[in-house]
């Protein structure tokens, strides 16, 4: 089941270099909104619409989360993030091929990683584009990330993915 949908999603992914999208992130009762640019492989910049002016940048194997209001940045290895499976196009295609599918309002790819952590990766049924994901963090908090793609394959200045300096 879902073989036809999977092949359409993969065909789409193969033709995408970058996407820009609006997002709503829900962690338990906490709701955050903002905009992101995702460039394959493994580059992501998200600007949150919050009072702390939170910004998240992923570049290759590092993730930096900055609260511009306080001038504070925390650095994390990307391997600790649920983003890791979505940022690499080849990894994402492999997951789509190997995972089971549930089709409801979305094409849902059910991915279970080596630590037995389940992530539901959602694609819309009309355009077969990424629509979001649901995962659980190490504290078993449910994190839902809903996205609305605003552009595909636009020219992007790679400087936007420059990590802040440490220290």
Where are these regions (language model features)?
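Flexible, surface-exposed loop/linker segments and immediately adjacent secondary-structure boundaries
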Residues: 69-107
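Short hydrophobic/aromatic-rich beta-strand segments that constitute the beta-sheet cores
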Residues: 21-23, 44-48, 63-66, 109, ...
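Extreme N-terminal tail/first-helix region
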Residues: 1-15
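Gly/Pro-enriched, hydrophobic low-complexity segments
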Residues: 91-167
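Low-complexity, acidic/polar, glycine-enriched regions of mature
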Residues: 9, 17-20, 69, 79
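A short, Trp-centered hydrophobic/proline-enriched beta-strand micro-motif
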Residues: 11-31
